[in-house]
Amino acid sequence: MAFKDWMNNLRDYFVEDDEEFNEPTRPVQESRPTVASTPKPKVEERKVQADYQSRRPAQTTPKPQTQTAAPKRSASTFSKPMPEKIVQQQTVSQAQSLAATVSTIAIKEPRAYADIMESARIVKNGECVLVNFKFMGDAQARRSIDFMTGVVFTLDGDIQNVGGQIFLMTPANITVDAAKEMSILAGQNFESYDIY
């Protein structure tokens, strides 16, 4: 009997350990995504530092003779070029934003309703369109204006009657202040034109 009791106790010993062993595996699986996400920023930092080091020899700046002792510098002095890079990135991004602010205005004079699709594509691509309906009949022009109003509405843009049969369609990122237009035109004595 002693042997049988010993075997049962031995079996119970391993069964209890198996149940306890299965519980810690769940938190280990949950912690894996956090471990995988932390190395990514380190890789990006290395790329930025490598990118900066590859650009540094290309820069030619006059250096005083007191700076020729570069090997004697401590590790803390190497962090100073990083703000220069940040400043360079800011100036590049400012130049890109200035280039992005330059926009073109396409001028279209459709002769049929089918020609309006081209104007809609231009507005969809983020440019302004000035549409003159002088070569189109009244019924087709109204139908075209209804279509253009729908296009501009879906793109969160704007459509304005500039004068008579001329309409300006603008995408969402461009706004036109009609009050400024009116003051400019009034100052130049263009009272005879229909401006709404």
Swiss-Prot record:
Region named Disordered: 15-80
Subcellular location: Cytoplasm
Origin superkingdom: Bacteria
Any Pfam family matching the protein: SepF
Keywords from the named record: Cell cycle, Cell division, Cytoplasm, Septation
GO biological process, one term: FtsZ-dependent cytokinesis
InterPro entries found in the cross-reference section: Cell_div_SepF, Cell_div_SepF/SepF-rel, SepF-like_sf
GO cellular component: cytoplasm
Protein's UniProt keywords contain Nucleus: no
Gene3D superfamilies: SepF-like protein
Compositional bias of kind Low complexity: 57-72
PANTHER family in alphabetical order: CELL DIVISION PROTEIN SEPF
Subunit structure: Homodimer. Interacts with FtsZ.
Protein purpose: Cell division protein that is part of the divisome complex and is recruited early to the Z-ring. Probably stimulates Z-ring formation, perhaps through the cross-linking of FtsZ protofilaments. Its function overlaps with FtsA.
Family designation: Belongs to the SepF family.
The protein's name: Cell division protein SepF
Lineage: Bacteria, Bacillati, Bacillota, Bacilli, Lactobacillales
